[in-house]
Swiss-Prot record:
Main function: This protein is involved in the repair of mismatches in DNA. It is possible that it carries out the mismatch recognition step. This protein has a weak ATPase activity.
Keywords of the record: ATP-binding, DNA damage, DNA repair, DNA-binding, Nucleotide-binding
InterPro entries assigned to the protein according to its UniProt record, in alphabetical order: DNA_mismatch_repair_MutS, DNA_mismatch_repair_MutS-lik_N, DNA_mismatch_repair_MutS/MSH, DNA_mismatch_repair_MutS_C, DNA_mismatch_repair_MutS_clamp, DNA_mismatch_repair_MutS_core, DNA_mismatch_repair_MutS_N, DNA_mismatch_repair_MutS_sf
Gene: mutS
UniProt KW ATP-binding keyword: yes
NCBIfam families cross-referenced by the UniProt entry: mutS1, PRK05399.1
Stated family: Belongs to the DNA mismatch repair MutS family.
Organism from which the protein derives: Rhodopseudomonas palustris (strain HaA2)
Any GO molecular function: ATP-dependent DNA damage sensor activity
Descriptive protein name: DNA mismatch repair protein MutS
Lineage, broadest ranks: Bacteria, Pseudomonadati, Pseudomonadota, Alphaproteobacteria, Hyphomicrobiales
Single Gene Ontology BP annotation: mismatch repair
Binding site for ATP: G660, P661, N662, M663, A664, G665, K666, S667
């Protein structure tokens, strides 16, 4: 279920999220502060910092306890009722945030903004404020992100046109990498565009959210946030964009349409609000021209299992099968390309040129991949540092990235004439400053903490003042160690320890059995009781308090100096941000090129010819996912050809009508040709012996069966809706694959629909298409439609058994072998026998006489008949049984020879 977040004061919280509870007339200062902060952030779960915990109250606590499976307790009273409360440790908060975000919740993180000691001195509650709004589309932490997937925030703006010609502007950003894109489309193309972008969160105007036409489909997105209309105001869009990018005019940015600018401005406005004024570095918006990528509707993406299987898993998808990348950034770029295949033959050729370099030079390929393995995720490290969320390891990531850039350049220098994409990548790798790398190398210690607040990340000897402060701190700690030994001697408690935590500070700890000794005279004059636990008793001393103050002061000074150094290094990195981002993109590009080259070499893929023709000629085509599965099982994949190119004197592509039995491989053949076209336009080599493909502008797939009960649609209705979309939208350049159209209704209805659909594809759409069917009557259309070609999947029948050969040949099938497949599936023998009887009767009757057929066929006499006898075993089954009955270890040589002759005698006689 989607959830709606409102962060604008003009919009009331939606009904499915809790409104802030009204504060009573008299509450504690802490709860008064909580109510004030909660009222300013409606529609979000408030993580309210209390010491080492984030605590949630009222409805927030009830929601979080259910979502996270944590205990719901209570804290004080509100209007005479217990206040529900739950909490999570600060140090483990990322785990809990990840689970809440994955469930569609939004969170406001409220931190303590002063030291509790300062609040006590003021005799007031600790100051707190919201420092971050966490929403599904604005994540930056590695712990909250999928390393191999982009995390997009999408803004959608609409412009009303006359006669229903509305236009949609879209802008999407990934603040974790800085990517920023815009495009414009018609309302009819919105669903395909949304499926391609696959946003983690979408923002729309409240009017669009409530729109009768588009609202329902928008609300199906994983997370959608309605905002006030002014956020999408095109009149102020340019000013807001110029302000964000700190430029005087839009001249330096892409030439955006008014609608694209409105969506782009909405994006940066939302980022400003959720990041509370901290601006992540974004690339200037890149404008995607209309028609620049292959249009693929949501149903086709799902049916072809491009990035996820129908079960929602990455494993088993096309992306999983072809992803040989070694970096997270490379995996993200490959997924982007697979989601948006190009329609520009020249741009595709440039990508293929980059892959070919590493196909023909396997040694260089492996050298580059080795260098890439050392390249960290620089883009995301940069984003975290710019937002103040980075840590020492992010600094190290950028240092290591520059080192990897040098290694990559050294290897790529072997190329005397690198193709355009590789040359551009090499230029980008030269951009980062080597002086910056040296500075980071001098500053950073070898063993780095995750958080900068933990300290210890600056190398000894980097800064003299820090070294001196550390010596003072460490000397005080040696005093504590000596004090522990002295206290143990004075008390006679050899197990006495001096420990530290954030609540008590330094304290003396003994086991429970020794606690009474320290609380009794004369030791109680020195040891002051602080806390009793189940197995330990804790004390402090005046001397320990003095030492703690010295250690704290020295430690605080050391940490303060380290944080100053961190900020100084982060500022240097921000200055070099554009160069570092360019290098990060170059790493991703090289990773994709080398990964696709490895795939091509390992799996025997070939470079496709992609041009502006209407050709579609595949020789020895294979299904990339099925082939890998069969290879793991030690079985071969049967390759097949497919030629949908226009024939002599024909201006349009062909339609193949494919017949054959179930389980013969028709659906695999259909899908593999669609995937080959998609891979070719992605810029990948393809699983074939040869492939020539004229640009496909739209890809349609109507394969498989599924209902849509939520919308009240039956399986047949879903099939018809998808078929209607194909027949209404397919262009001459489209590639269409259709499987079993018309199967979900009465035979003659289904046959009629399939018949008419083929005629429409041939005469109106005039596109390249593959049409699989069990309606063998349709093969007669080839005599009437000149571009319709009959093909069949070859099978062999042997003594009542059917053998699937998976070979596609010219011709047509006259049988579907459904009963044989049913037998293989394990249907009871009596059912199989009865099915054969019914089939014989059906085939003997005139199918044009349904009344006579029904009267003649005793379908309702089953209950009056004796159960059918199981069919006798076939000769093949008898032969298998005879072999299974043999026990070779128990046979003498003579008996074994006799058994062999007996088996030979059972073989069917052949002429």
């Amino acid at each position: 279920m989607h959830r709606v977040m409102t962060i604008h004061p003009d919009i009331a919280p939606p009904p499915d999220l809790p409104a802030p509870a009204e504060p009573p007339a008299k509450v504690s200062p802490m709860m008064e502060q909580y109510h004030e902060i909660k009222a300013a952030n409606p529609g979000l779960l408030l993580f309210y910092r209390m010491g080492d915990f984030y605590e949630l109250f009222f409805e927030d606590a009830e929601i979080a306890s259910r979502a996270l499976g944590i205990t719901l307790t209570k804290r004080g009273k509100h209007q005479g009722m217990d206040i529900p409360m739950c909490g999570v440790p600060v140090e483990r908060s990322d785990d809990y945030l990840h689970r809440l975000i994955a469930l569609g919740h939004r969170v406001a993180v409220c931190e303590q903004t002063e030291d509790p000691a300062a609040a006590r001195a003021r005799k007031s509650v600790v100051r707190r404020d919201v420092v971050r709004l966490i929403t599904p589309g604005t994540l930056t932490e590695d712990t909250l992100l999928d390393a191999r997937a982009n995390n997009y925030l999408l803004a959608i703006a609409r412009a009303r046109g006359s006669s229903g010609t509305d236009r949609i502007g879209l802008a999407w950003i990934d603040i974790s990498t800085g990517e920023f894109s815009v495009t414009e489309c018609a309302t009819g193309e919105l669903s395909a565009t949304l499926a391609r972008i696959n946003p983690n969160e979408a923002i729309v105007s409240d009017a669009l959210y409530s729109d009768a036409e588009l609202g329902p489909s928008l609300r199906e997105l994983a997370a959608v946030t309605p905002l006030t209309r002014d956020v999408f105001d095109s009149a102020t869009a340019e000013r807001r964009l110029c302000d964000y990018f700190a430029v005087a005019t839009m001249d330096g940015l892409a030439a955006l349409s008014r609608l694209e600018a409105a969506a782009a401005a909405a994006c940066v406005t939302y980022v400003d609000r959720t990041q509370l004024g901290k601006r992540p570095p974004l690339s200037p918006p890149s404008r995607e021209a209309t028609g620049a990528t292959m249009a693929i509707d949501p149903a086709t993406r799902a049916n072809l299992e491009l990035t996820r299987t129908l079960a929602g898993e990455r494993r088993g998808s096309l992306l999983d099968a072809i992803d040989c990348t070694v970096t997270a950034a490379g995996s993200r770029l490959l997924a982007q390309r697979l989601a948006a295949p190009l329609t520009d033959a020249a741009a595709i050729a440039r990508r293929l040129d980059a892959v070919e370099v590493f196909v023909v030079a396997p040694a260089l390929r492996e050298q580059i991949r080795s260098a890439l393995r050392a390249a960290p995720d620089m883009a995301r490290a940069l984003a975290r540092l710019s937002l103040g969320r980075g840590g020492p390891r992010d600094l190290a990531s950028l240092r290591d990235g520059i080192v990897a850039a040098d290694q990559g350049l050294q290897q790529l220098s072997q190329l005397t004439a690198p193709p355009q994409e590789i040359a551009a990548a090499m230029a980008a790798l030269r951009r980062p400053s080597r002086d910056l790398c040296d500075e980071l190398g001098r500053a950073l210690a070898d063993d780095l903490p995750l958080q900068k607040r933990d300290g210890g990340f600056v190398r000894d000897g980097y800064e003299a003042a820090l070294d001196e402060t550390r010596k003072l701190r460490d000397a005080s700690r040696l005093v504590v160690a000596a004090m522990q030994a002295r206290y143990a001697d004075d008390t006679g408690v050899k197990g006495l320890k001096i420990r530290h935590n954030n609540v008590l500070g330094y304290f003396v700890e003994v086991t429970a059995q020794h606690g009474d000794r320290l609380m009794a005279p004369p030791l109680n004059a020195t040891f002051i009781h602080r806390q009793t636990l189940a197995g330990q008793v804790r004390f402090t001393t005046a001397e320990l308090g003095e030492i703690e103050a010295k250690i704290a002061n020295a430690g605080d000074r050391a940490l303060g100096l380290e944080l100053e150094i961190f900020d100084r290094l982060a500022a240097l990195i921000e200055t070099a941000g554009e160069d570092l981002r360019a290098a990060a993109h170059a790493f991703a590009l090289l990773d994709v090129a080398t990964a696709l080259a490895k795939l091509a070499s390992d799996d025997n893929y070939v470079r496709p010819e992609v041009d502006q023709s209407l050709s579609f000629a595949i020789e020895g085509g294979r299904h990339p996912v099925v082939e890998q599965a069969l290879k793991r099982a030690g079985e071969p994949f049967i390759a097949n050809a497919c030629d949908l190119s226009p024939g002599p004197a024909q201006a349009s592509g062909q339609i193949w009508l494919l017949t054959g039995p179930n389980m013969a491989g028709k659906s695999t053949f259909l899908r593999q040709n669609a995937l080959i076209a998609l891979l070719a336009q992605t810029g990948s080599y393809v699983p074939a012996a040869r492939a020539r493909i004229g640009i496909v502008d739209r890809l349609f797939s109507r394969v498989g069966a599924a209902d849509d009960l939520a919308r009240g649609r039956s399986t047949f209705m879903v099939e018809m809706v998808e078929t209607a979309a194909i027949l209404n939208q397919a262009t001459e350049r489209a590639l269409v694959i259709l499987d079993e159209i018309g199967r979900g209704t009465a035979t003659f209805d289904g046959l009629s629909i399939a018949w008419a659909a083929i005629e429409h594809l041939h005469e109106q759409n005039r596109c390249r298409a593959l049409f699989a069917t069990h309606y063998h009557e349709l093969t007669a259309l080839s005599a009437k439609l000149p571009r319709l070609f009959n093909a069949t999947v070859r099978v062999k029948e042997w003594r009542g058994e059917v053998v699937f050969l998976h070979e596609v040949l010219p011709g047509s099938a006259d049988r579907s072998y459904g009963i044989q497949v049913a037998k293989l599936a394990g249907l009871p023998a009596s059912v199989v026998a009865r099915a054969k009887s019914v089939l014989a009767k059906l085939e003997a009757n005139d199918r044009g006489q349904p009344k006579a057929l029904i009267d003649d066929l005793p379908l309702f006499a089953i209950t009056a008949r004796a159960p059918a006898e199981p069919s006798p075993p076939s000769e093949a089954e008898q032969l298998i049984a005879a072999v299974q009955a043999l026990h070779p270890d128990e046979l003498s040589p003579r008996e074994a020879l006799d058994a062999l002759y007996a088996l030979k005698a059972k073989l069917p006689k052949t002429t």
